[in-house]
């Protein structure tokens, strides 16, 4: 398995893990008072999109940090 293939596999797994963790964390937020009557589908879609956005941002931060830490030996 080449290095690029390994990085791609790690990237996919990390994104899925952080999206799942974000979904789990957002379940603690009570958005019921914010939802208008009859707008349940839109609220669920908002939670899904918010989960993907936050999870992807955190995963990108983690992967960037991992990548930068692997490149540090080239500094010296």
From Swiss-Prot:
GO terms for cellular component: plasma membrane. It holds the Pfam family DUF1146. Keywords: Cell membrane, Membrane, Transmembrane, Transmembrane helix. Coiled coil: none annotated. It comes from the Bacteria. Its main location: membrane. Signal peptide: none annotated. The chain crosses the membrane at residues 9-29, 45-65. It is a multi-pass membrane protein. InterPro entries: DUF1146. It is found in: Cell membrane. NCBIfam families: int_mem_ywzB (TIGR02327). This is Uncharacterized membrane protein YwzB. It comes from Bacillus subtilis (strain 168). The gene is ywzB.
